[in-house]
């Protein structure tokens, strides 16, 4: 007599070729999503924005290679432009190519948009990475809104141009061991280096 019982096991189909609709679900379950926010306020003019765009492209490339879907926000005192989280970085690269400086500084609209974008992505690791050369705008409101992101399991990485900016942005960072500081000569490298904060990045 058989001593085993037949059971049904439901799981995402992983043997389809070409990949079927289960692929996106598997990526969400075992991968991550990151929104990269770039300050495009007026003080980012000249070589600052040029180097920042190069660094953002490198960050996005590393994130995609690590199985992260990527969204992008260009922010000043509001939202200059954005693309939703996706595993295809083409739209993010296209927006970066159009990045133009204007306006002042207020991180709050960026935080709110990134919050919605990341919750929609529903990944196992949700990250907001921010680069700027100024402050938060309204630090009290920024801290209040950032707390909502962290309550939903979203990690926040920040990098500022110069010590003053870095310390200001670090108020909303969930990293406790370091304050990421960029110099004008290292903007691209510093932005790209934030990818080290992605949990699933292989080094």
Label each PLM-derived region with a short phrase.
Residues 1-35, 42-48, 203:
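Acidic, polar low-complexity linker/tail segments
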Residues 6-8, 99-104, 134-182, 192:
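VWA/integrin I-like adhesion module and closely mimicked acidic/polar interface patches used
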Residues 21, 55, 109-116, 141, ...:
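Well-ordered alpha-helical segments embedded in enzymatic catalytic cores
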Residues 26-84, 110-111, 127-131, 159:
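Von Willebrand factor
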Residues 45, 78-84, 137-140, 166-169, ...:
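Switch/connector loops and helix/strand junctions flanking conserved nucleotide-binding motifs
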Residues 62-65, 121, 147-154:
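Arginine/glycine-rich "motif VI" loop of SF2 helicases in the C-terminal RecA-like domain
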Residues 68-98, 113, 117-119, 167-175:
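Short beta-strand-loop
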Residues 180-203:
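C-terminal "exit" segments of structured domains
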């Amino acid at each position: 007599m058989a001593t085993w019982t037949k059971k049904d096991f439901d799981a995402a189909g992983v043997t389809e070729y070409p990949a079927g609709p289960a692929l996106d679900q598997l990526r969400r379950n075992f991968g991550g999503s990151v929104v990269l926010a770039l300050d495009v306020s007026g003080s980012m003019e000249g070589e600052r924005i040029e180097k920042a765009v190069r660094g953002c492209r490198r960050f996005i490339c590393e994130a995609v290679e690590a199985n992260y879907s990527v969204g992008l926000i260009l922010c000043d005192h509001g939202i200059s432009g954005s693309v939703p989280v996706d595993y295809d970085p083409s739209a993010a690269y296209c927006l970066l190519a159009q990045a133009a400086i204007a306006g002042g500084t207020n991180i709050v609209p960026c935080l709110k948009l990134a919050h919605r974008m990341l919750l929609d992505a529903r990944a196992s690791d949700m990250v907001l990475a921010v680069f700027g050369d100024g402050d938060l705008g309204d630090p009290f409101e920024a801290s209040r809104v950032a707390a909502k992101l962290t309550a939903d399991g979203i990690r926040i990485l920040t990098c500022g141009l110069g010590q003053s900016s870095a310390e200001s942005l670090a108020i909303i960072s969930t990293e406790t061991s370091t304050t990421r500081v960029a110099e004008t000569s290292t903007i691209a490298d510093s932005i790209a280096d934030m990818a080290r904060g992605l949990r699933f990045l292989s080094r």
